[in-house]
Amino acid sequence: MDLRPELPTASSASQVHPGAAAAAAAASIPVSMAGNLLRGPPLLLRAADKYPRTPKCARCRNHGVVSALKGHKRYCRWKDCMCAKCTLIAERQRVMAAQVALRRQQAQEESEARELQLLYGTAEGPAIAAANGIIPPRPNYEVFGSVSSESNSADSSIQKYELFPKNQLSGSATPQPSAGKPASTEGDSAPGISSPDGRHGGSGSENGDSESFISSPVSKPLKDGEETPGSVSSIGSDSGSETDKDDQEPSPSSAASRHMNAIDILTRVFPSHKRSVLELVLQGCGKDVVQAIEQILNNSGAQGPNKAGPDETWTAERMLQNAQQLPAASATTTAPTRPMLPGAMTLSNRSAFSPLQPNAPHFGADPSTYPLGTHLGLNPLRLAYSAHSRGLAFMTPYSTTGLMPTLGFRPPMYYAFSDLIRDRTMLHKEQGYASGLYGPLVNNTPEKQ
């Protein structure tokens, strides 16, 4: 009976105050139980305590899917996605991989440098490591890199091609007077040759003009053949105007230095010949060293070993001695020499920039002058100073119309070697082909008909 009135009062109280009933129920729950509800399951807590957070796929996370990264790279659905977020992730991964590789390399180099410091000491370790290539040199600003490389290459080329030292060149530039020949008469005989050499040799030795000694002896004949107008006029005197020749002429200092170097080369190659003779030969050849050497070799080869000494091999030297009016006692040998060539007189009288005439009377017709037969008219001066092409002289035995009908050669009398071809064609036909085409050349004596 007593319970009945209490129940409706309790129910009425709950209906009247529902918020108070909820607060009373929450107050009756223990605190430990509330903590367990907020903490989560104990299985996940143990995994989080033992292991770190497992990495997740960033591409999947961009698209709202959570997937572990381990073994997932090949099977990711968005591995080829090209959206903005995935492209940014790929670029970030590339940069991170490059940074990791760089740090790994730097750590390896530092460890090797420490080992070398322990082995060789603190001061010598980095230097030896850099020399061995273990530690590459730090990249610096190459502001003067190209200039230094050009200077180094220029220095190496100077060391490679400077075969003649400066002191020897300056010493040999001043002509030494011989015993039987005073220096004053030599300067009077060739004033245009010896005086510029002496002046330039002195200035080169005092001022250190490196420009006159840099050029190599090997490339010097090419430069002389290209730049000097003497060689151009010797090949074709009609080609080019006077203004072109003036433009092609180098400065006097460079021309004098080139001439001095050419004279020094000739004096080194032929020490037995006198300097004045070599200067005359070089002037006659248009300052071409190659032609001068060929002339000296041809003329010295034409003379036997028992005929005369080295001082009497050149007729130009005898001309120089006659011009200086030296006594006959200065001659070293008394053996008879070759007669003076009329063409040799033109070496000093004519200019170096005008070609020598290739006519036969200018070169003499003595059969003992040259080893080649006079019926061909082949001599070194003629081949070297022809106004036309030099290759024509070696084709003249074949340049008749009967042997080469297809080539458009003009008749022989139009060439500068017309007398050469006429002499060859005037030979008896049986004489020319019975003993061979070059039989008279080998025997050095024309056959008797």
Swiss-Prot record:
Give the matching InterPro entries: DM_DNA-bd, DM_DNA-bd_sf, DMA, DMRT, DMRT5_1_DMB_dom, UBA-like_sf
GO CC annotation terms, alphabetical: nucleus
Gene3D superfamilies to which the protein is assigned, alphabetical: DM DNA-binding domain, DNA helicase RuvA subunit, C-terminal domain
Q: What does this protein do?
A: May be involved in sexual development.
Q: Which SMART domains match?
A: DM (SM00301)
Give residue spans, biased composition: Low complexity: 230-240
Membership in a protein family: Belongs to the DMRT family.
Instruction: Name one molecular function that GO assigns to this entry.
Output: DNA-binding transcription factor activity, RNA polymerase II-specific
Name of the protein? Doublesex- and mab-3-related transcription factor A2
Q: Which residues form the DMA domain?
A: 260-295
Summarize which parts of the chain are annotated to bind DNA, as ranges.
57-104
Q: Where in the cell is it found?
A: Nucleus
Species, as recorded: Oreochromis niloticus
UniProt entry keywords in alphabetical sequence: DNA-binding, Metal-binding, Nucleus, Zinc
One GO term (biological process): sex differentiation
> Which residue intervals make up region (Disordered)?
166-259
Query: Is Metal-binding included in the keywords of this UniProt record?
Result: yes
> What domain of life does the native source organism fall in?
Eukaryota
Residue ranges under compositional bias (Polar residues)?
A: 167-177
